């Protein structure tokens, strides 16, 4: 890869990416220096922030269209519309979870919606006690794959990176799907796959579902 990267955010996800992309990162921005973003340009912008930097990123991309990967969650409807607007000018890849495993689970649910509707559906999401959003962005992503909204329960405890359990109940049977993260490297690897994907695109809005269809 012969490209330069602007990395927004300096939290756990960003730190897992930095060793893997150290030869390509031009600068790492956080809430203390995000105002400096306009002074830099790169081939790719990766947003790993907590969404507090959105306005700076939006203004930057309007002036400097850049292939963009959005890993942050919790965007408002207005912000999502702004992201879609930007995707008319440049490729934007967005996901609440960059794990291929979660993408496979979502595909299974979408492909079998009619049958799954016959079950009572539940999602349980487990994360570390400092996790801010509840339910998690991943739970919301999984919820969007159902045609009928499942019941969601969020548990925040200990130092769990991330675990999601989907239960489908009928009178005489139960289906359980569990996805557990044991290392944040799984997200970093997914982001690197999305970099390879987005480098081939000129504009448009893309998700892990699009990436999965091209693997």
Language model regions located:
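Amphipathic, non-transmembrane alpha-helical secondary structure
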Residues: 38, 55-62, 106, 110, ...
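C-terminal substrate-binding/catalytic lobe of Rossmann-fold NAD(P)-dependent oxidoreductases
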Residues: 4-39, 117-215
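Short, conserved beta-strand edge motifs with alternating hydrophobic and charged residues
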Residues: 70-72, 94-95, 122-126
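Conserved strand-to-helix beginnings and helix N-cap segments that scaffold or border functional pockets
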Residues: 58, 80, 105-106, 135-139, ...
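Rossmann-fold NAD(P)-binding glycine/threonine-rich loop
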Residues: 52, 72-94, 100-103, 108-112
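A generic structural signal for well-ordered alpha-helical segments
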Residues: 21, 61, 84-87, 116
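Short glycine/serine/threonine-rich phosphate/pyrophosphate-binding segments
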Residues: 13-17, 53-56, 105
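Rossmann-fold NAD(P) dinucleotide-binding segment
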Residues: 37-39, 44, 48, 52-71, ...
